[in-house]
Amino acid sequence: MMIKQCVICLSLLVFGTTAAHAEETPLVTARHMSKWEEIAVKEAKKRYPLAQVLFKQKVWDRKRKDEAVKQYHLTLREGSKEFGVFVTISFDPYSQKVNKIAILEEYQ
């Protein structure tokens, strides 16, 4: 009987501390967003304020002497509706000043 109680106490001590450490360490670390990715998400949230961003991906980018363009595809959920939008950002590559932002909802 005494051995059984010692085994139970020891197992609680070992597994209890392991569980406490597991809660402290995050399972998934947040990925750092680039400046332009943050702008794309912010602009999409302006147009769709109640939407939740599920997924974001850079589709393409182009850099010329006087203009750079980046396009992102965002998957959004608004209520039960799930849809995609393309956010295209045009900016000056030297000053980083935004020239134009276009948001186009993906055709369903």
UniProtKB/Swiss-Prot annotation:
InterPro entries recorded: DUF3889 (IPR024987)
Keywords: Signal
Signal peptide interval: 1-22
Alphabetical list of Gene3D superfamilies matching this protein: Protein of unknown function DUF3889 (3.10.450.390)
Residue ranges of the TM segments: none
Origin superkingdom: Bacteria
Protein name stated in the entry: Uncharacterized protein YqzG
